[in-house]
């Protein structure tokens, strides 16, 4: 009887002689396993400001500070009695009834040179930078590779890589530009963030309430506009809430959070949202914040305090031979807080320029006289203009293992 035995297991079939073997020992599943493209979370938050030609690489914009604002610092102030005062902003941002009453711009019957105020403007600016990378391939890599869709896969991954780089750079810039920063626990800086002691740097419900209060005082809208659609031409407005971005490491901590009454603070999306209002990556809400889980969320490895054997189970990294706590951000992006800067764009998304030259006459030169090597490159311009840094907010905390 003729039997088949698997050659890959080291046993020949009965028909194969000493110098013979099966030619096909596996079935090739032609459709390659493609790593899922990392989704975008931050790029859809802003439109793109187009940098025109012949104006350099920097965009500037003025922000005019309101009259009644502590940031309106000027030397033009004259009060109701005619005396020169330090700041010409009347009572500024004060909410004290006594202070407001004493600085009201009252006029007498004769008027006079009183109640002079001044104004302040702040210049914001951002610059664009050029990014790019390429890969090379030979004619034989195309002709003889077992995957006849090789070039298609490589072209797709080229574009995906550029998109992911842009997403990471934008996230880095948003974290660095945050004008409102809170530290969990008793910490007052990155270097004092710890998971130990009686007041560890673990985010609490009170931290979220405090952050919402500060953002409200900063006039941050409780709605967020997100660019959607396959061509990035549609928008979706998320109202009456603020959007908070966190890494996967913090989600267990948030799900275990208790409110001021000892009840579960975290509400899963299935309890309040439908398919039309849920955002990409949204996992739930706490107080006024809708929580977006970002798998590629950045953090500061080893930027916290030195860890000891008393670490109850929070993430650390080795720095100069010592374990230090990792610092994890919880990022809130207020509406219209920033804009991306591009060059020759459509005003909705960054424009990528791809150039491909196949092996042959196009690539033949003194370095490759036979024209056996081709290449594909991608380049783009990127920049960010932070218009209202006070609407970008962070809570810095430790994260459990």
From Swiss-Prot:
One GO term describing the cellular component: viral capsid
Residue ranges crossing the lipid bilayer per the database entry: none
Keywords: Capsid protein, Virion
Residues in the signal sequence: none
Localization in the cell: Virion
Function: Assembles, to form an icosahedral capsid with a T=9 symmetry, about 60 nm in diameter, and consisting of 535 capsid proteins.
Annotated protein name in UniProt: Major capsid protein
Protein encoded by which gene: 56
């Amino acid at each position: 009887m003729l039997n088949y035995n698997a050659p890959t297991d080291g046993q020949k079939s009965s028909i194969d002689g000493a110098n013979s073997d099966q030619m096909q020992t596996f079935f090739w599943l032609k459709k390659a396993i493609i790593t899922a493209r990392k989704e975008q979370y931050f790029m859809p938050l802003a439109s793109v400001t187009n940098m025109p030609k012949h104006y350099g690489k920097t965009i500037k914009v003025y922000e005019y500070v309101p009259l009644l604002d502590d940031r309106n610092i000027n030397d033009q102030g004259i009060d109701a009695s005619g005396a020169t005062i330090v700041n010409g902003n009347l009572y500024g941002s004060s909410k004290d009834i006594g202070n407001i009453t004493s600085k009201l711009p009252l006029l007498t019957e004769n008027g006079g040179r009183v109640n002079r105020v001044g104004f302040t403007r702040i210049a914001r600016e951002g610059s664009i930078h050029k990014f790019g990378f390429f890969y090379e391939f030979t004619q034989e890599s195309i002709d003889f590779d077992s995957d006849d869709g090789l070039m298609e896969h490589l072209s797709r991954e080229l574009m995906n890589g550029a998109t992911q780089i842009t997403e990471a750079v934008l996230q880095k810039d948003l974290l660095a530009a945050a004008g409102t920063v809170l530290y969990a626990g008793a910490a007052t800086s990155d270097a004092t963030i710890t998971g130990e002691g009686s007041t560890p740097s673990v985010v609490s419900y009170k931290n979220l309430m405090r952050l919402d209060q500060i953002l409200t005082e900063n006039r941050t809208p409780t709605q967020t506009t997100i660019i959607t659609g396959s061509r990035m031409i549609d928008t979706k407005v998320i109202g009456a809430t603020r959007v908070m971005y966190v890494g996967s490491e913090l989600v267990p901590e948030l799900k275990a959070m208790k409110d001021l009454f000892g009840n579960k603070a975290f509400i899963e999306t299935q309890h309040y949202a439908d398919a039309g209002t849920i955002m990409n990556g949204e996992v739930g809400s706490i107080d006024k914040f809708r929580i977006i889980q970002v798998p590629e969320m950045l953090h500061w490895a080893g930027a916290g305090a030195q860890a000891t054997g008393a670490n109850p189970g929070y993430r650390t990294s080795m720095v100069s031979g010592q374990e230090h706590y990792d610092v994890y951000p919880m990022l809130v992006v207020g509406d219209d807080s920033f804009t991306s800067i591009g060059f020759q764009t459509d005003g909705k998304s960054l424009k990528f320029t791809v150039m491909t030259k196949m092996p042959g006459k196009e690539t033949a030169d003194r370095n490759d006289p036979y024209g056996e090597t081709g290449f594909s490159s991608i380049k783009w311009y990127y920049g960010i203009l932070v218009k209202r840094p006070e609407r970008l907010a962070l809570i810095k905390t430790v994260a459990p293992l």
